[in-house]
Amino acid sequence: MKKITVIQGDITKVSAEAIVNAANSSLLGGGGVDGAIHRAGGPVILAECQLIRNRQGGCKVGDAVITGAGNLPADYVIHTVGPRWSDGRHDEDALLKRAYQSCFKLVDYHGIKTVSFPNISTGIYGFPKERAATIALDVIKHCIAENRTLENVNLVCFDAENYDLYLKLLN
């Protein structure tokens, strides 16, 4: 039975085959969940991100790349770049949807069974939380139904507001 689990806590401590990183386009680490994943995972993640940068020049908004997970309780880190919120008239919704879809393409390609997502773009990028949660759940429900190997999607919420929002939207 495929399931969606909502967790409040630190994504770097949640065991899953893949952890999604809300990265920036440089792939060099940053603040929020991105910084936490790089710190907890260790230098191997940054080294792999630098190889990707050298090959393709970073990661565009809406795209995703995959690396090993270093010291994290996972096999992979999927780095995706969500959009910065400006006013909702610059394709932010479509770009956030594409960021989640890009992650699921990598999940499918690598036969991943369990993946943990943070709340992409809702921190410093300022995406309205309920709007982001609705987009995330629409994509997740569609992809979990289509994917042959995926069994569990963890939504790991750093704050109580996102946690409560996801619980409300799922019920």
Curated annotation (Swiss-Prot):
Catalytic residues, chain numbering: D34 (proton acceptor)
One Pfam family from the record: Macro
UniProt cross-references to PANTHER family, sorted A to Z: GANGLIOSIDE INDUCED DIFFERENTIATION ASSOCIATED PROTEIN 2-RELATED, MACRO DOMAIN-CONTAINING PROTEIN
Residues given in the record as substrate binding sites: D10, I11, N24, G32, V33, D34, S121, T122, G123, I124, Y125
NCBIfam families given in the database record: PRK00431.1-6
HAMAP family according to UniProt: YmdB
Coiled coil: none
Purpose of the protein: Deacetylates O-acetyl-ADP ribose to yield ADP-ribose and free acetate. Down-regulates ribonuclease 3 (RNase III) activity. Acts by interacting directly with the region of the ribonuclease that is required for dimerization/activation.
Catalytic reaction(s) noted: 3''-O-acetyl-ADP-D-ribose + H2O = ADP-D-ribose + acetate + H(+); 2''-O-acetyl-ADP-D-ribose + H2O = ADP-D-ribose + acetate + H(+)
Family classification: Belongs to the MacroD-type family. YmdB subfamily.
Quaternary assembly: Homodimer. Interacts with RNase III.
Any GO molecular function: O-acetyl-ADP-ribose deacetylase activity
InterPro entries from the UniProt entry: Macro_dom (IPR002589), Macro_dom-like (IPR043472), O-Ac-ADP-ribose_deAcase (IPR024900)
Name the UniProt record assigns to this protein: O-acetyl-ADP-ribose deacetylase 1
Keywords: Hydrolase
Enzyme Commission number(s) of this protein: 3.1.1.106
Top-level taxonomic group: Bacteria
GO BP, one annotated term: purine nucleoside metabolic process
Lineage, top ranks: Bacteria, Pseudomonadati, Pseudomonadota, Gammaproteobacteria, Enterobacterales
Domain Macro: 1-171
